[in-house]
């Protein structure tokens, strides 16, 4: 039986996400990112194509490394202005039934107690269709604007993330017992306080004495996504991730990354297939190879090279304006997206990219490769990435929105279905059940969150803290 390919749309609540300048194309609706109807239409379109998920990226800083300023990013709308990624999800869920929503939130800038509530709320309102893309943030501008002197070091951010996840799992999985919520109108008991427990967490970075203030949602813990395959990021993913987003420039490099991740997952006590791995890809297609190539050339005529260099400046922490455009890029240690620079300095056949290469090959597609072709050519390549590269699926970025998604659904999905690679209907249940296959929609028993199930049963509860009251048995007055 052929392996089904997981299909996620990769988007962001901004104008220019991965392709700089193409918002100017006549068919682009990218400038409607503030319009709720844009997002609800997108969700319905994805469900028409039986996509697994809308993966929503986010940043809370700006791209101000290139030429020492955010001016170019603002001029080209390169991930700025950008809205909160949570805002449109409930509306999208209201017009769909199955497609999932992977929302990005950085652990560096929000307390776990608050973020746990936001994610549980969405999991309730979507009936269990939420994933959380865990990131540690990489833009120094974001750190400065929340009052930090500078961005935390790369590995320290992952140390924080380890403890952050521990707090989240305690809140989601442990603080409420399964039968804590009674909803008993006759007795007047909505929640049995003896079955709700403070987590009493006190660690190096976080202190959370209380209990989760949301009742358990359909999945309790949302599906955990993680982006980044640096050494420390891979270790974090091997323990926590159920879906992992990787950047790669070749099938060979993808095979190395996916094999390493699965080896680490196995070493962490999880199965090798417990993590679904998605790679970034932009597909430009039509009814033939020639039509797709013509479309690609048209899109390139709208691309903005300096806009892409502004994005790459933020992604790598390097001001490309200061580099010789024809000199190979050099690997370096900094606190930006390490895998971005690694993908450019350790590429296929040891190729090292130049600034001119980035301009020529990445103005469309951004952080990932671009695949141009008709249905058969594209399907062949997708199968090769899956069968030889070891990925489970793709985060599909757009060149022009919503046209790139519609073209993929109209041209590529039917071809993949002919080959037994794409679903033509959805399984019932939560996103986790659809994507991972767990029967009850809860995290697998080998996942670190599972250790907190029933962990507080028999321990201190909210009821234990209740003081005597003379009004405990009082009745409401009856109007005469």
UniProtKB/Swiss-Prot annotation:
Lineage: Bacteria, Pseudomonadati, Pseudomonadota, Alphaproteobacteria, Hyphomicrobiales
The protein's name: Dimethyl-sulfide monooxygenase
Record-linked Pfam families: Bac_luciferase
Family note: Belongs to the NtaA/SnaA/DszA monooxygenase family.
Keyword field: Flavoprotein, FMN, Monooxygenase, NAD, Oxidoreductase
Regulation: Inhibited by umbelliferone, 8-anilinonaphthalenesulfonate, a range of metal-chelating agents, and Hg(2+), Cd(2+) and Pb(2+) ions.
EC class: oxidoreductase
Protein function: Monooxygenase that mediates oxidation of dimethyl sulfide, the first step in dimethyl sulfide degradation pathway. Has much lower activity with diethyl sulfide and other short-chain alkyl methyl sulfides.
Cofactor(s) it depends on: FMN
Disulfide bonds: none
Molecular function GO terms recorded: dimethyl sulfide monooxygenase activity
Organism, as annotated: Hyphomicrobium sulfonivorans
Catalytic activity line of the entry: dimethyl sulfide + NADH + O2 + H(+) = methanethiol + formaldehyde + NAD(+) + H2O
CDD domains for this protein: Nitrilotriacetate_monoxgenase
Entry EC no(s): 1.14.13.131
Residue positions binding FMN: 58, 104, 154, 158, 230
Chain coiled-coil ranges: none
Miscellaneous comment as given in the Swiss-Prot or TrEMBL entry: DmoB has not been identified yet. Only a peptide from the protein encoded by a putative flavin reductase (AC E0XCR3) was obtained by mass spectrometry, which is insufficient for linking this gene to DmoB.
Description of how the protein assembles with itself and partners: Heterodimer of 2 subunits, DmoA and DmoB.
Region (Disordered) residue spans: 423-480
């Amino acid at each position: 039986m052929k392996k089904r390919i997981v299909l996620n749309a990769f988007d962001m609540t901004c104008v220019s996400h991965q392709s700089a300048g193409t918002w100017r194309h006549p068919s682009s609706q990218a400038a409607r990112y503030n319009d709720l109807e844009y997002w609800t239409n997108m969700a319905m379109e994805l469900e028409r194509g039986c996509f697994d998920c809308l993966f929503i990226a986010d940043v809370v800083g700006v791209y101000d490394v290139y030429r020492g300023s955010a001016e170019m990013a603002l001029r080209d709308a390169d991930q700025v202005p950008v809205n909160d990624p949570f805002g449109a999800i409930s509306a999208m869920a209201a017009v769909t039934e199955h497609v999932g929503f992977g929302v990005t939130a950085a652990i560096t800038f929000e307390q776990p107690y608050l973020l746990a509530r936001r994610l549980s709320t969405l999991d309730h309102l979507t009936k269990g269709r939420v994933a959380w893309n865990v990131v540690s943030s990489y833009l120094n501008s974001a750190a400065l604007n929340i009052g930090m002197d500078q961005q935390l070091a790369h590995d320290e951010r992952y140390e924080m993330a380890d403890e952050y996840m521990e707090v989240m799992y305690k809140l989601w999985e442990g603080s409420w017992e399964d039968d804590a919520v009674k909803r008993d109108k006759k007795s007047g008991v909505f929640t049995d306080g003896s079955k709700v427990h403070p987590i009493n967490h006190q660690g190096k970075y976080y202190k959370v004495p209380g209990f989760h203030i949301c009742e358990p949602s359909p999945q309790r813990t949302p599906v955990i996504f993680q982006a980044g395959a640096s050494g420390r990021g891979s270790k974090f993913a091997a323990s926590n991730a159920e879906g992992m987003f990787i950047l790669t420039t070749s099938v060979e490099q993808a095979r190395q990354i996916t094999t390493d991740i699965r080896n680490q997952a196995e070493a962490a006590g999880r199965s090798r297939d417990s993590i679904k791995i998605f790679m970034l890809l932009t597909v430009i297609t039509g009814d033939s190879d020639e039509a797709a190539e013509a479309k690609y050339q048209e899109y390139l005529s709208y691309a903005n090279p300096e806009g892409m260099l502004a994005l790459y400046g933020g992604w790598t922490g390097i001001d490309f304006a200061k580099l010789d455009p024809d000199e190979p890029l050099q690997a370096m240690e900094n606190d930006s997206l390490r895998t971005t620079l690694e993908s450019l300095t350790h590429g296929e056949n040891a190729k090292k990219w130049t600034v001119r290469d980035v301009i020529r090959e990445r103005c469309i597609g951004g952080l990932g490769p671009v695949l141009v072709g008709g249905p058969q050519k594209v399907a062949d390549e997708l199968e090769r990435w899956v069968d030889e590269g070891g990925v489970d699926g793709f985060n599909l970025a757009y060149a022009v929105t919503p046209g790139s998604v519609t073209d993929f659904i109209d041209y590529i999905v039917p071809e993949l279905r002919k080959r037994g690679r794409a679903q033509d209907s959805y399984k019932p249940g939560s996103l986790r059940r659809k994507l991972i296959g767990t029967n009850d929609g809860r995290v697998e028993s080998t996942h670190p969150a599972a250790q907190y199930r029933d962990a507080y049963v028999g321990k201190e509860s909210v009821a234990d803290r209740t003081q005597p009251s003379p009004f405990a048995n009082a009745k409401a007055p009856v109007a005469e």
